[in-house]
A protein has these predicted regions:
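N-terminal membrane topogenic signal
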Residues: 19-32
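Short, Lys/Arg-rich, polar N-terminal cytosolic tail immediately upstream
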Residues: 1-22
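Early transmembrane hairpin of solute transport permeases
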Residues: 29-156
Length: 156
């Protein structure tokens, strides 16, 4: 058995390829397609956040490069967690709407230091993770009337 065959066998068992009627080649093509579909974020996210983030001793170009690397890493880690923990083929990356709000409204508009605003985002993320693991997320979603859910989806 070749290395590729053993790899295909491992991933096939791990992710249930037979049940999903797929194979490693199809999943690799799907992954590349997903990455290319969301790759615009690697350019736009650093451009948006770079307008608000200044780090002493680093040029704006260096800050933009750091933000691009962090964008790539966060998208890769989030997508891998979704794949291996939830067994779902979802590509996750930073959202431009919230990034624009963070950069232009909170940091530049309200004058809050970007470090403080980023700390608030981290705390918010931790709260959402706790709400999900405790099981409150489902109760909160169930409490929202369907018309509100539909209108929020349409508004976004």
């Amino acid at each position: 058995m070749s290395f590729v065959d053993s790899l295909a066998d491992y991933f096939g068992k791990r992710f249930g390829f037979k049940k999903a009627k797929t194979d490693l080649r199809t999943e690799i093509i799907a992954g590349i397609t997903t990455f290319l579909t969301m790759s615009y974020i690697v350019i736009l996210n650093p451009a948006i956040l770079g307008a608000a983030i200044q780090i002493d001793g680093y040029s704006p170009a260096q800050v933009t490069q750091m933000l691009a690397i962090v964008t790539l890493l966060s998208a890769a880690i989030a997508s891998l967690v979704m794949a291996f923990h939830a067994n779902r083929p979802f590509g996750l990356a930073p959202g431009l709407g919230l990034n624009a709000f963070f950069a232009f409204t909170v940091v530049l508009g309200m004058g809050i230091a970007w470090e403080t605003a980023l700390a608030a985002v981290v705390v918010e993320g931790i709260i959402f993770i706790i709400i999900t693991y405790v099981g409150w997320r489902d109760a909160i979603i169930a409490a929202i009337p369907k018309p509100v859910k539909f209108s929020v989806g349409a508004g976004i």
